[in-house]
Amino acid sequence: MAANDTISDMLTRIRNSCMAQHTTTKVPATKMTRSIAKVLKDEGFIGEFEQEGEGIKKYLVIFLKYKGKNRQPIIRYLKRVSKPGLRVYKNRKELPRVLGGIGIAIISTSSGIMTDREARKRGIGGEVLCYVW
């Protein structure tokens, strides 16, 4: 099934896989999903990710992380903020702090996809894609 909003599709697949305690999940590979996966990996929310397939059928295989004996998912909350029907833009002064700095907001800026902390440090704003903690 083709998804019009690849970011929401990616976040939903990760959220569902975490709740089912799967070790991996597959998401369609686009520049945007690769960038978001890189930010999640750099922030320690997911393990590795690798690209699989050729041509149109490219997928990212994302390795999920858990903690403790009960395998609690590292990602406890994953929410899409800016949607195709209602885009949410914030300037550098309005960038949100998620849970007082414990979580992250993933921002799409003119300099690429980054966390809210990095965007604040560079002094740039952009589209708030999602919140993660």
From Swiss-Prot:
GO terms for cellular component: ribonucleoprotein complex; ribosome. InterPro entries: Ribosomal_uS8, Ribosomal_uS8_CS, Ribosomal_uS8_sf. GO terms for biological process: translation. GO terms for molecular function: rRNA binding; structural constituent of ribosome. SUPFAM superfamilies: Ribosomal protein S8. Disulfide bonds: none annotated. The keyword Magnesium does not apply. It comes from the Bacteria. Keywords: Ribonucleoprotein, Ribosomal protein, RNA-binding, rRNA-binding. The keyword Cytoplasm does not apply. PANTHER family: 40S RIBOSOMAL PROTEIN S15A. NCBIfam families: PRK00136.1. One of the primary rRNA binding proteins, it binds directly to 16S rRNA central domain where it helps coordinate assembly of the platform of the 30S subunit. Belongs to the universal ribosomal protein uS8 family. HAMAP family: Ribosomal_uS8_B. Part of the 30S ribosomal subunit. Contacts proteins S5 and S12. This is Small ribosomal subunit protein uS8. It comes from Trichodesmium erythraeum (strain IMS101). The gene is rpsH.
